[in-house]
Amino acid sequence: MAEWEFAESKPSDELAQLYYFSMKMPQPGGVVEFVITVKEFANPRDHSLKFFASADKQTNQKTVPFTPCGWGESLLKALAECIVAIHKFPYEGN
């Protein structure tokens, strides 16, 4: 357990450490940059959900908007799931 995790006084606080990543996805109109935030929860409700990754932009905006995300027991798993989710649909923003 990392030292910062002991700072959480109540599990309902859902204390999390944040990690930031960026990736670029080529699109017909140019390159779109996504910023992915990964949260590492101090005391997750389920150990397999310790890490949650979420993109800063939605994809598939003109049909059914979708926010790419991923869960996992490791930072790598959550980040990789989010990247796969980004590639599932086209970016249809401005």
What is the predicted role of each segment?
Residues M1-E3, H87-N94:
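Short intrinsically disordered terminal tails
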Residues M1-V35:
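Negatively charged, low-complexity tracts enriched in Asp/Glu with abundant Ser/Thr
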Residues W4, D13, K50-F52, L75-K77:
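Short, intrinsically disordered, low-complexity terminal segments
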Residues A7, P26, T37-F41, S54, ...:
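A structural detector for beta-sheet-dominated domains
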Residues D13, P28-G30, D46, T67-G70, ...:
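Intrinsically disordered, low-complexity segments enriched in proline/serine/threonine
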Residues V32-T63:
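A short, structured beta-strand/loop element
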Residues Q58-K77:
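A short, exposed loop/beta-hairpin motif centered on an aromatic-Gly-Thr core
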Residues S74-I86:
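Stable alpha-helical structural segments in soluble proteins, enriched in small hydrophobic residues
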